[in-house]
């Protein structure tokens, strides 16, 4: 199955082509663990109180998992028409 990178309007056009009248939606299919990146967190300077107030959930999100969506799957990497079909209604 051939794969290619699809970004921006090319990705949208491909979704219209694959999904047709069914339409499409964004729904993350996979989750990626960002635990190995936690060492970089220790290199950041401490936040002042004002920044902590503006981003109260920052620490909770820092060690969480990132959802992998269609842009990461098809633009940052390559995907096939079969992958795209997973985003159809």
UniProtKB/Swiss-Prot annotation:
GO cellular component: extracellular space
Pfam families: Insulin (PF00049)
InterPro entries: Insulin (IPR004825), Insulin-like (IPR016179), Insulin-like_sf (IPR036438), Insulin_CS (IPR022353), Insulin_family (IPR022352)
Annotated GO MF terms: hormone activity
PROSITE patterns: INSULIN
Protein name: Insulin
UniProt organism field: Callorhinchus milii
Domain of life where this protein originates: Eukaryota
One GO-annotated biological process of the protein: glucose metabolic process
Keywords of this entry: Carbohydrate metabolism, Cleavage on pair of basic residues, Disulfide bond, Glucose metabolism, Hormone, Secreted
Recorded family membership: Belongs to the insulin family.
Propeptide: 33-66
């Amino acid at each position: 199955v051939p794969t290619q990178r699809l970004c921006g309007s090319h990705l949208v056009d491909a979704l219209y082509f694959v999904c047709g009248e069914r339409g499409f939606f964004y729904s993350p299919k996979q989750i990626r663990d960002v635990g190995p990146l936690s060492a970089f967190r220790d290199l950041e300077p401490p936040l002042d109180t004002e920044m902590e107030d503006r981003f109260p959930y920052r620490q909770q999100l820092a060690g969480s998992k990132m959802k992998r969506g269609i842009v990461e799957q098809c633009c940052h990497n390559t995907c096939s028409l079969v992958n795209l079909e997973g985003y159809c209604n």
